Design a protein with these regions (language model features):
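N-terminal low-complexity or simple alpha-helical regulatory segments
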Residues: 1-127
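Short, contiguous, pocket-lining structural segments
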Residues: 9, 138, 142, 214, ...
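Residues within well-ordered alpha helices
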Residues: 20, 30-31, 153, 183, ...
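Short, solvent-exposed positions on alpha-helices
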Residues: 29-30, 140-141, 259
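N-terminal regulatory/effector-sensing and dimerization cores
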Residues: 37, 81-204
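Hydrophobic alpha-helical core bundles mediating ligand binding, dimerization, or RNAP-core interactions
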Residues: 58, 147-150, 247
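Extended mid-to-C-terminal alpha-helical interaction segments
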Residues: 182-265
Length: 265
């Protein structure tokens, strides 16, 4: 069962994921050709593609990796770099709390297949990722990737060192001890499986810690730019954008002609 209609993923992020797969040795281009998979923008929303297409792509691609925990491994390899602007904003926020708030604000630039929120209980902060992916295999590895990225951000973002003291996974534990140890070694803390949500737990006081090399002025400029991007992407596609998309599709299909362009417009 795929994600429901209305969920989407940034095409820019999809391309970065494909490049990451190539770097890891996956025959990405061969798989794209074999399954006739194309990066097709959503009509009226040219910066994104349907999440169900991306879920299928991940289902195929992740299974090509010999690693039993491909999502976790890709998280280790990519660190925060995959998130581009979001990661850069995080690095320039003044505190851990401000950094996490900025990521939550900008999450829609990446996708709406998951939503991050920050909740508090006495003495503890919980960074929760609500996942809308239905395919159990894909959900397992995307969830592992997301939580590893958040854990690294919190643990390496300040002078305090290791802050995350527990991680919850909303999928079953691996059956063999060796794979379970990989999880625990990667997160360097207890990992709880079959939890209700994907969750990273750390001291509530950590949200007020200063972030390494924070630059509040640069953060303000970048935040304003990111907000403009969000506003622009929320607008309906213009006639020019629609025309560009149609022509790109014709180019991909090898059917470019004056008649075909006129017919699509």
């Amino acid at each position: 069962m795929a994600v429901s209609a209305g969920f989407k993923v940034s095409i820019e992020i999809v391309k970065k994921v494909l490049d990451l797969g190539r770097q890891y040795g996956v025959d990405v281009d061969g798989l794209l050709k074999e399954y006739d998979f194309r990066i097709q923008p959503i009509k009226g929303d040219p910066a994104y593609m349907p999440a169900e297409d991306v879920e299928f792509m991940l289902s195929v691609g992740l299974r090509q990796m010999s690693d039993p925990l491909p999502g976790l491994t890709l998280g280790v390899v990519s660190q925060q770099q995959l998130f581009g602007l979001v990661a850069f904003l995080a690095q320039t926020s003044s505190t851990v709390g401000a950094c996490l708030e900025k990521i939550m604000q900008l999450e829609p630039l990446i996708s709406n297949i998951g939503k991050t929120c920050l909740e508090y209980s006495p003495g503890e902060a919980q960074l929760i990722w609500h996942c809308h992916i239905q395919d159990p295999f894909v959900r397992t590895h995307v969830g592992s990737f997301i939580l590893f990225t958040y854990t690294q951000l919190i643990n390496t973002g300040t002078q305090a060192g290791h802050l995350v003291h527990e991680v919850h996974m909303a999928h079953p534990a691996p059956k063999d001890r060796a794979t379970l140890d990989v999880y625990r070694n990667a997160f360097n803390c207890p990992v709880i499986f079959n939890a209700r949500h994907y969750r990273v737990l750390f001291p509530a006081t950590a949200v007020d810690l200063s972030v390494n090399t924070a630059d509040p002025m640069l953060n303000t400029v970048l935040a304003e730019h990111a907000q403009k991007l969000l506003e622009e992407r929320a607008k309906p596609a213009s006639f020019t954008d629609e025309g560009r998309l149609h022509i790109q599709k014709l180019l991909q299909d090898g059917n470019v002609s004056r008649e075909n362009v006129a017919a699509m417009l």
